[in-house]
Every structure is written in structure tokens, then in C-alpha cells.
């Protein structure tokens, strides 16, 4: 199996959540993905390849959101689920890498369960609402409720990627519309609404571990200013891509290198 990639179910709260693991390292890395339309099931090999840089140093884990998302679920609730999954697998003192909504969840994980977090990476995320994220999420919810998946996928691409990237891949938009159609519309809407429940800013001082903030100045999903707010509040290390936006984690070739260097203290050779 490529990079020892595996898929399994993790039992918690009388339910099972999809779990991906890969890598063969002694240390644990918890990756918390952002809002997505499809979930992580079936993505173990592609994710292992995308984050192969971490596979020797770490055993990497990703936990999907719970299958039945209750109305009004918050990102803090999701952090509680991640903590429960880590407890179920006996994982403690892990490095944690949260992207977008995953970064919101990661903040609450570090605040509420400091025993679980050794180092923390907060990528293209926020700690409190702002007009950019509010308008973005509200539009995505409306488009989903209307069943306008074509415009939803196009709007996601325009807001996430650089203009050059969107122009290059515009011919593939019809294919993306099919591939990114939400499997469960109601679940996606509830998860999207949860993006507006992050209010960790006034509790950031409770985070006890080293933190690295990384983002894009041109972020049209959560706003480029959001990363700076977190880093200033924590007094932690930060790196911003001047010409990239929310999908800096995909577009920047050195993105994983920077995360790896912070977490391990090693340069990628």
C-alpha cells in the first residue's frame, strides 16, 4: 500500500467516523481538513501522496466529520469529536495541522485538550468572524439550497484560488461540478454554517504549545487579515503568501516544506 495508506472506522459517541492513516513514523500528526463537499472516504492514497513529505517522520491521521451532523453543531463540538477519536486510538501529545475550518477546530482542540497537542499549525483560517467569511458562507449555503451546484463550485474556485490558477483550469469546471457535488446537501449546509461559530480569539491565550500560522494575503474565503489577528494575539511565528489566497496550501510549492520545518525543526532535503 502506498505510504502505508489505510482507511478504517473509528468508534466514538455510539457512531463510527471515517478515518484515514498513512506513514510509518513514531510521532503522530493529526491533520484536520477544511469544509468539503465529499468527505474523506476513498481519498487515502491521494492524500498520502499529497502529504508524503510527512510519511517518514509521522503516522498521519485524518478524521472525517461525524456522518449525522446535528443542527447547530459548532466547530468546538467538532474539536470534541477529534479529541474523542484521538482518545479512542490512544493518541496523545500529537502535532496538529488544521486547514481552514480544520484550523478553527484545531484551535479549540488546543484550548480544551492541551494534553493532546504538542505543536499546532493553523493554515488559512480565522479565530473570529469577519464580513469576508460571513458573505462567503452565506452565499455557499444559498447556492446549495437552490441546487445550483455549478455556480457553487465556480464560486468556490474563484474565492479559493489565484486568478491565474482559475484561468488555467477553467476548462475543467464542468468536470469539477460533477466531482464536487455534495453527497449529502443537508450535511454540507450544517457543516458550512459551523464555519460561522468560531469565536476562539478571546481564548487563544489558553493555547500552551508552539504555534505556526500560515496563510494567503489574497484570501477571499476567510480574509487575509484573519491569520495576522491570530499570530499577533499569540505572538507566534507567521508566514503569508502575498499573491495567493485560501488555496495557498495547494498552490504554493513550498507550503508543506514550511509546515514540515516548523513541526520537525528540519529542512526538507
Regions from the language model: what does each represent?
Residues 220-226:
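Conserved alpha/beta-hydrolase "acid-adjacent" motif
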Residues 104-107, 111, 118-147:
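Flexible "cap/lid" loop of the alpha/beta hydrolase fold
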Residues 9-69:
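Conserved HGGG/HGGXW glycine-rich cap/lid loop of the alpha/beta-hydrolase fold
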Residues 77-94:
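Conserved acidic catalytic loop of the alpha/beta-hydrolase fold
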Residues 244-257:
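Catalytic histidine-centered segment of alpha/beta-hydrolase-like enzymes
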Residues 94, 98-103, 216:
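Conserved alpha/beta-hydrolase "nucleophile elbow" surrounding the catalytic nucleophile
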Residues 207, 213-215, 219:
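Short beta-strand/loop motif that positions the catalytic acidic residue
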Residues 131-134, 150-203:
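Conserved alpha/beta-hydrolase catalytic His-Asp/Glu region
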Amino acid at each position: 500500500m502506498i505510504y502505508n495508506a489505510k482507511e478504517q472506522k473509528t468508534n466514538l459517541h455510539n457512531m463510527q467516523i471515517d478515518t484515514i492513516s498513512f506513514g510509518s513514523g513514531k510521532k503522530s500528526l493529526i491533520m484536520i481538513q477544511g469544509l468539503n463537499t465529499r468527505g474523506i472516504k476513498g481519498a487515502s492514497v491521494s492524500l498520502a501522496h499529497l502529504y508524503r513529505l510527512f510519511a517518514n517522520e509521522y503516522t498521519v491521521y485524518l478524521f472525517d466529520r461525524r456522518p449525522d451532523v446535528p443542527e447547530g453543531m459548532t466547530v468546538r463540538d467538532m474539536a470534541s469529536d477529534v479529541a474523542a477519536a484521538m482518545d479512542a486510538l490512544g493518541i496523545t501529545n500529537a502535532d496538529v495541522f488544521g486547514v481552514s475550518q480544520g484550523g478553527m477546530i484545531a484551535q479549540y482542540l488546543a484550548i480544551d485538550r492541551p494534553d493532546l497537542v504538542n505543536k499546532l499549525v493553523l493554515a488559512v483560517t480565522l479565530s473570529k468572524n469577519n464580513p469576508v467569511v460571513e458573505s462567503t458562507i452565506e452565499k455557499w449555503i444559498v447556492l446549495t439550497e437552490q441546487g445550483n451546484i455549478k455556480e457553487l463550485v465556480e464560486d468556490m474556485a474563484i474565492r479559493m484560488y489565484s486568478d491565474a490558477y482559475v484561468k488555467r483550469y477553467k476548462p475543467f469546471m464542468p468536470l469539477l461540478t460533477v466531482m464536487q457535488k455534495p453527497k449529502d446537501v443537508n450535511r454540507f449546509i450544517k457543516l458550512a454554517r459551523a464555519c460561522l461559530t468560531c469565536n476562539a480569539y478571546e481564548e487563544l491565550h489558553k493555547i500552551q504549545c508552539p504555534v505556526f500560522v500560515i496563510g494567503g494575503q489574497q484570501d477571499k474565503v476567510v480574509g487575509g487579515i484573519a491569520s495576522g489577528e491570530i499570530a499577533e494575539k499569540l505572538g507566534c511565528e507567521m508566514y503569508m503568501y502575498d499573491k495567493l489566497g485560501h488555496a495557498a496550501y495547494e498552490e504554493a510549492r513550498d507550503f508543506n516544506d514550511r509546515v514540515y520545518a516548523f513541526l520537525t525543526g528540519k529542512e526538507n532535503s
